[in-house]
Amino acid sequence: MAKIKFEEGIKKLEEIINQLENKEQGLDDALELFQEGVRLYRICNEKLTEAEEKISVMIEEGNQLVERPFEGGEE
């Protein structure tokens, strides 16, 4: 998988969405853009998953801070 920063992937994905919404390309070009968008989505989603696994939440129990794994939910 390509080494791409999350922010760069999101920016490229937004550009692809804008191009697809303009409907100015032919079917073959639109399909190619769609496939690239799916690839970028998967890369960005994987990076988010990796980041969530690294995040810990500090919870105060009594007078101590206890580290707990991040348990984020779907929006």
Curated annotation (Swiss-Prot):
Its main location: cytoplasm. One of its GO terms (biological process) is DNA catabolic process. Bidirectionally degrades single-stranded DNA into large acid-insoluble oligonucleotides, which are then degraded further into small acid-soluble oligonucleotides. It comes from the Bacteria. Keywords: Cytoplasm, Exonuclease, Hydrolase, Nuclease. Coiled coil: none annotated. One of its GO terms (cellular component) is exodeoxyribonuclease VII complex. Belongs to the XseB family. One of its GO terms (molecular function) is exodeoxyribonuclease VII activity. It holds the Pfam family Exonuc_VII_S. Its EC number is 3.1.11.6. It catalyses: Exonucleolytic cleavage in either 5'- to 3'- or 3'- to 5'-direction to yield nucleoside 5'-phosphates. It comes from Alkaliphilus metalliredigens (strain QYMF). Heterooligomer composed of large and small subunits. It is an enzyme of class 3 (hydrolase). The lineage of its organism: Bacteria, Bacillati, Bacillota, Clostridia, Peptostreptococcales. This is Exodeoxyribonuclease 7 small subunit. It is found in: Cytoplasm.
